[in-house]
């Protein structure tokens, strides 16, 4: 009995000691608060950062549209069966991000939020409303559904909250407060050993641009954005990744090859170029420090050609005059362009010759190695040309990729010659007239009159409804 009483007394003593050791909490103790809601309306920050806002707004001056398919009809054939064969304009100012994604024929003409050919993910590089929706709905929630679901929600052009933590004290005090507003971009940077929060100021500057100016694909049932960087960021690394998971963006309707469509891999190509290797960032060349009317320095947000601000960009490193530097860049651009056209010509022939082989009775087993050669050849071509500034960012890498594209196309065409001969086709496979965009689109069976009419009806009826819903909800600038 004495032993039991002693044990009970000992246990109560231990409980009392543990209780006294526990931290005291009160109603006044601080608790973690949820993050401030992301403000997607760029105009809200006009008074806070007037020079930056006004220079960002000036991207509306970059309004000219360049029809890439009209300039190069071969691309219609290379993208047969994919929306890019309908419409592909070269990029213009950030102020047109929403307008252009609404108006492109690639996004179709949906009538309802559940209609249309493309997923929600197609908004992901267009607006700070994307970051707002991810914060509100979670990443999984944001990616669910069709592109049209985001129409009334995503209405503000690419701007402040895409790159800056606009709710932070640092931003309020005039500091950059750079951030990765897309969680999938943060994961991708970590996958290549570049955690954002451990990066230098220069590294972070390029990473915020690299949220969008990258290669990516839509993964899984909900078509979530993912960067294919698990093996690295070179063309062969990403190809290996895609092949391992048997991913293809679409099947070319002529050759039936399972194709990959490169997006805009500026981060990857810049990284292997002379500027990337020397920590010369996107900001240094495209968003230099300039002075306002009062002589105060600020970062110019009218993102554009470095030659437009030569004294504030190139001369920080180069001693040559502007004309000399422009001549060097023009020479590199010409070299890239000439090899690009050669690669395209071989690929176009390969697609039509593959079609001829199918028509002659070729089997899937016979065609499989040929189609993989076509896939790999076009992937290299596309990654080079989709990076619009590769002649400046990494000309050697651009020439290398295009050169290997030619080699892969040659392998495909050599195999096709042999296979066609086995099937009794010994003459040259003639190409249809694809000398213009319109003729090339006709050759792959596109009814452009109907596609354009449906799009115009969408712009006249659905888009005004989106804007009205956004206006009533207070989401518009």
From Swiss-Prot:
Record-listed heme c 3 binding positions: 94, 209, 212-213
Annotated positions binding substrate: 216, 264
InterPro entries according to UniProt: Cyt_c552, Cyt_c_NO2Rdtase_formate-dep, Multihaem_cyt_sf
Binding, heme c 2: 160, 163-164, 301
EC number(s) reported in the record: 1.7.2.2
GO molecular function, one term: calcium ion binding
Record-linked SUPFAM superfamilies: Multiheme cytochromes (SSF48695)
Annotated keywords: Calcium, Electron transport, Heme, Iron, Metal-binding, Oxidoreductase, Periplasm, Signal, Transport
CC per GO annotation: outer membrane-bounded periplasmic space
Binding site for heme: 122, 125-126
Binding site for Ca(2+): 215-216, 261, 263
Subcellular location, principal: periplasm
Gene3D superfamilies: Butyryl-CoA Dehydrogenase, subunit A, domain 3, Flavocytochrome C3, Chain A
GO biological process, one term: nitrate assimilation
Catalytic reaction annotation: 6 Fe(III)-[cytochrome c] + NH4(+) + 2 H2O = 6 Fe(II)-[cytochrome c] + nitrite + 8 H(+)
Compartment(s) of residence: Periplasm
Annotated family: Belongs to the cytochrome c-552 family.
Name of protein: Cytochrome c-552
């Amino acid at each position: 009995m004495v032993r039991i009483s002693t044990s009970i007394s000992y246990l109560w003593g231990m409980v009392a000691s543990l209780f006294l050791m526990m931290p005291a909490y009160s109603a006044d103790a601080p608790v973690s608060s949820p993050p401030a809601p992301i403000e997607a309306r760029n105009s809200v920050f006009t008074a806070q950062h007037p020079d930056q806002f006004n220079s960002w707004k000036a991207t509306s001056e970059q309004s000219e549209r360049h029809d890439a398919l009209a300039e190069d009809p071969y691309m219609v054939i290379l993208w047969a069966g994919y929306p890019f064969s309908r419409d592909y304009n070269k990029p213009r100012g950030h102020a047109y991000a929403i307008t252009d994604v609404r108006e492109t024929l690639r996004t179709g003409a949906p009538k309802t939020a559940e209609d249309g050919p493309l997923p929600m993910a197609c908004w992901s590089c267009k607006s700070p409303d994307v970051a707002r929706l991810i914060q509100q709905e979670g990443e999984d929630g944001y990616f669910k559904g069709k592109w049209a679901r985001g129409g009334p929600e995503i209405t503000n052009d690419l701007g402040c909250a895409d790159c800056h933590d606009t709710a932070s004290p640092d931003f309020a005090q005039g500091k950059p407060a750079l951030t990765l507003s897309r969680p999938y971009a943060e994961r991708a940077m970590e996958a290549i050993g570049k955690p954002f929060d451990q990066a230098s100021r220069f590294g972070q500057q390029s990473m915020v641009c690299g949220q969008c100016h990258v290669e990516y694909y839509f993964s899984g049932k909900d078509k979530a954005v993912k960067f294919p960087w698990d093996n690295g960021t070179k063309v062969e690394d990403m190809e290996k990744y895609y092949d391992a998971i048997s991913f293809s963006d679409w099947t070319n309707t002529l050759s039936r090859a399972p194709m990959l469509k490169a997006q805009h891999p500026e981060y990857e190509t810049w990284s292997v170029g002379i500027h990337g290797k020397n920590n010369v960032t996107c900001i240094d060349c495209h968003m230099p420090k300039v002075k306002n009317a009062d002589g105060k320095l600020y970062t110019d947000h009218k993102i554009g050609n470095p030659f437009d601000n030569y004294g504030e960009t190139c001369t920080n490193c180069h001693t040559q005059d502007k004309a000399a530097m422009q001549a060097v860049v023009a020479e590199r651009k010409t070299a890239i362009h000439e090899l690009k056209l050669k690669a395209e010509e071989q690929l176009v022939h390969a697609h039509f010759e593959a079609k001829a082989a199918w028509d002659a009775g070729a089997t899937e087993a016979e065609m499989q190695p040929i189609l993989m050669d076509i896939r790999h050849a076009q992937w290299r071509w596309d990654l080079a040309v989709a990076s619009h500034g590769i002649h400046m960012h990494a000309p050697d890498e651009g020439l290398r990729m295009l050169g290997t594209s030619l080699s892969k196309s040659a392998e495909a065409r050599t195999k096709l010659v042999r296979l066609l001969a086995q099937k009794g086709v010994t003459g040259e496979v003639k190409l249809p007239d694809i000398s213009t965009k319109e003729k090339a689109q006709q050759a792959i069976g596109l009814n452009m009159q109907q596609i354009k009419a449906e799009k115009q009806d969408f712009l006249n009826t659905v888009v005004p409804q989106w804007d009205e819903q956004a206006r009533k909800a207070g989401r518009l600038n």
